[in-house]
Amino acid sequence: MGRVSAWEALLLGVVEGLTEFLPVSSTGHLTLLFHLLGLPVEEDPFLKTFLVAIQLGAILAVLLLYGRRLAADRALWLRIAVAFVPTGVIGFLFYPLIKGVILGNDAVVAFFLFFVGAVLLFADRLAERAQYQDVKALPLARVAWIGVFQGLAALFPGTSRSGATILGGLLLGLNRQAAAEFSFLLALPTMFAAVGYDLWKSAPEVPEGGWSLLLLGFLAALVTALVTVRWMLAFVARHGFRPFALYRMALAAVYAFFFLR
C-alpha cells in the first residue's frame, strides 16, 4: 500500500474515468501508467483491489446518468440482456485463458490497439449510411452479435470493451450516437459481473490507511466518467470516431516503444 500515493490514486482514477467509456482501451492506458509510475500491479494485492474500486466508480457514473431511463424502458433492458448473454458465455469459458495467458501480454496489447483503430476508421465511414438510429430498432440477432464483439474484446487486452461494442454497433447498422450509448449501457451488467467475479476469486486486501486511497480513486473515476460520457455523445455527433481511431494507432506505437524494445 505504501507504493501508491494520494496523487497517484487520483491520477489513476481520472485515467480510468476518462478511458473506460472511450474506444481507446482503458487497460492499455492503465498498464502504461502503472509502468511509468513504477507500480507493480501484478504483484501488489492492494493495487488489484484499487483497480476494482476505480472500475466501480466508472460504472456508477453510467448508473447515475441512465438509471431513471432504464427503470422505465423494458425494451432497452431486453436488448442489454440479449447482448450480455454471449458476453457472459465467452467470459466464463475463457476466463482462465484471459487471466493466465493473454492478460499482460504486451505484444497483444500493442497489436490490438492498432488493429481495432484501423477497423474503427472503416466502421466510422459506414456510420454515415447507418440504418438504425436507436438500438431498440435493431433486430435482436444483431444485438446479440454486439455481445459477441464485447466478449471477444475480453480475450484480447488492448481491444477495449467500449471499442469493441461501438465497433460492433457501427458494423451492424447503428449510427454513431446509438452505438456509443448502447456501449455505455452494456457496460453495466458486464462490468458488475467482471468486478464481482474478481472479488469472489480473490478477496480484497485493504491495509491500514488504504480506504482513503480507494475512496479517492473511486470518486475521481466517478466524476471523470460522468463528464466523459456526456462529452463523448456530443463529440461523436460532430466528429465521429475517426479521432479516437487515429489516437489508438498512435498509442500503439507509444506502447510498443515502452514495452517491446
From Swiss-Prot:
Predominant subcellular localization, coarse grouping: membrane
Location relative to the cell: Cell inner membrane
Recorded GO MF terms: undecaprenyl-diphosphatase activity
Pfam family, one: BacA
Alphabetic keyword roster: Antibiotic resistance, Cell inner membrane, Cell membrane, Cell shape, Cell wall biogenesis/degradation, Hydrolase, Membrane, Peptidoglycan synthesis, Transmembrane, Transmembrane helix
Cited InterPro entries: UppP
Topological relation to the membrane, as annotated: Multi-pass membrane protein
GO cellular component: plasma membrane
Keyword Transit peptide: no
Something else known: Bacitracin is thought to be involved in the inhibition of peptidoglycan synthesis by sequestering undecaprenyl diphosphate, thereby reducing the pool of lipid carrier available.
Protein name: Undecaprenyl-diphosphatase
Organism listed in the record: Thermus thermophilus (strain ATCC 27634 / DSM 579 / HB8)
